[in-house]
């Protein structure tokens, strides 16, 4: 019985650790909007001038990181998706550049450094 309790405790700790990482993980970065975005880029560029360059802007854009995705029809697509599919229109991208992306989703310092 103690073995089962230990496994239950380990599973609970693992779930709590994963939840903490999901909510507080730095993978997405901080959200920067308007003046905060400009200051974050300024600071990042000041630091990156002293360090080696990261990825180029064209590399980032090639990864489709800052582009909208085309609509795809699936079996469980909503009525709105079906209407767009039938009309031949594409949904408008929810962001148009790195500034919008950083405001909506957040950016890491390495992502901000591509504009330097």
Curated annotation (Swiss-Prot):
It comes from the Eukaryota. Residues 51-90 form a propeptide. Expressed at high levels in the radial nerves. In the radial nerves, detected in the peripheral area proximal to the tube feet but not at the side of the hemal sinus. Expressed at low levels in cardiac stomach and pyloric caeca with trace amounts in the ovary, testis and tube feet. Keywords: Cleavage on pair of basic residues, Disulfide bond, Hormone, Secreted, Signal. Residues 1-29 form the signal peptide. Disulfide bonds join 33-103, 45-116, 102-107. One of its GO terms (cellular component) is extracellular space. Heterodimer of a B chain and an A chain linked by two disulfide bonds. Induces oocyte maturation and ovulation in vitro in ovarian fragments and induces spawning behavior and gamete release in vivo. Probably mediates its effects by binding to a G-protein coupled receptor located in follicle cell membranes. Following receptor binding, stimulates GTP-dependent adenylyl cyclase activity in follicle cell membranes of fully grown ovaries at stage V but not in young ovaries at stage IV, leading to the production of cAMP. This stimulates the production of the maturation-inducing hormone, 1-methyladenine, in stage V but not stage IV ovaries. This is Gonad-stimulating substance. It comes from Patiria pectinifera (Starfish).
């Amino acid at each position: 019985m103690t073995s089962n309790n230990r496994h239950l405790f380990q599973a609970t700790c693992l779930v709590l650790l994963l939840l903490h990482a999901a909510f507080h993980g730095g993978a997405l970065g901080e959200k920067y909007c308007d003046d905060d975005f400009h200051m974050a880029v300024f600071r990042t560029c000041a630091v990156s001038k002293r360090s080696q360059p990261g990825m180029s802007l064209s590399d980032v854009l090639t990864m489709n990181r800052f582009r909208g995705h085309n609509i795809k029809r699936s079996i469980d697509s909503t009525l709105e998706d079906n209407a767009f599919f039938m009309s031949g229109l594409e949904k408008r991208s929810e962001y148009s550049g790195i500034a919008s992306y950083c405001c909506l989703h957040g950016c890491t310092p390495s992502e901000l450094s591509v504009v330097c």
